[in-house]
Each structure stands twice: as C-alpha cells, then as structure tokens.
C-alpha cells in the first residue's frame, strides 16, 4: 500500500502580519498563493487559514479579470519567478 504524504504544519502569513483586507491590486502580496504557472495554490501547501484563503481567491480572481495577473501560462513561457519584473 502507498504511504500517506505527511505535510508539515504551516502558519498563515496573513494572520501573523495582522492583515485585515487583501487588495487585488497588491500583486506582491498575492504571489505567495500562486504557483509558477499562476495557479492558485491550495491551503495545505501555503498554510493559509480558511478566512484568508477565501479572500486571496477573490482577490486573485479580480486581479485576473482586470488583467493584472494572467489566467494561464503556456508550457513554453513558464517563468521561475512570476513577479520578478514588477
């Protein structure tokens, strides 16, 4: 039988920083919850609490709608650090 993956306990960056609102225009704050292909990372990997994960998801979706963050990235255009040029 396959072994279960064990994830280490991670702590919410937003709770520690006492963030009250996550703005969709602040892409540097949103980069912690995006993968190198600009996909939203799950809570178990980022350690974000449920409250802040919902706020982050809404902010990322709004930023995508306003074209601050791309929806998808092609396999040829994958970047290691998506916010390097900002």
Swiss-Prot record:
<comment type="function">
    <text>Binds as a heterodimer with protein bS6 to the central domain of the 16S rRNA, where it helps stabilize the platform of the 30S subunit.</text>
</comment>
<dbReference type="Pfam" id="PF01084">
    <property type="entry name" value="Ribosomal_S18"/>
</dbReference>
<dbReference type="GO" id="GO:0003735">
    <property type="term" value="F:structural constituent of ribosome"/>
</dbReference>
<comment type="subunit">
    <text>Part of the 30S ribosomal subunit. Forms a tight heterodimer with protein bS6.</text>
</comment>
<keyword id="KW-0694">RNA-binding</keyword>
<comment type="similarity">
    <text>Belongs to the bacterial ribosomal protein bS18 family.</text>
</comment>
<protein>
    <recommendedName>
        <fullName>Small ribosomal subunit protein bS18</fullName>
    </recommendedName>
</protein>
<keyword id="KW-0699">rRNA-binding</keyword>
<keyword id="KW-0687">Ribonucleoprotein</keyword>
<dbReference type="GO" id="GO:0022627">
    <property type="term" value="C:cytosolic small ribosomal subunit"/>
</dbReference>
<dbReference type="InterPro" id="IPR001648">
    <property type="entry name" value="Ribosomal_bS18"/>
</dbReference>
<dbReference type="GO" id="GO:0006412">
    <property type="term" value="P:translation"/>
</dbReference>
<dbReference type="GO" id="GO:0070181">
    <property type="term" value="F:small ribosomal subunit rRNA binding"/>
</dbReference>
<keyword id="KW-0689">Ribosomal protein</keyword>
<dbReference type="InterPro" id="IPR036870">
    <property type="entry name" value="Ribosomal_bS18_sf"/>
</dbReference>
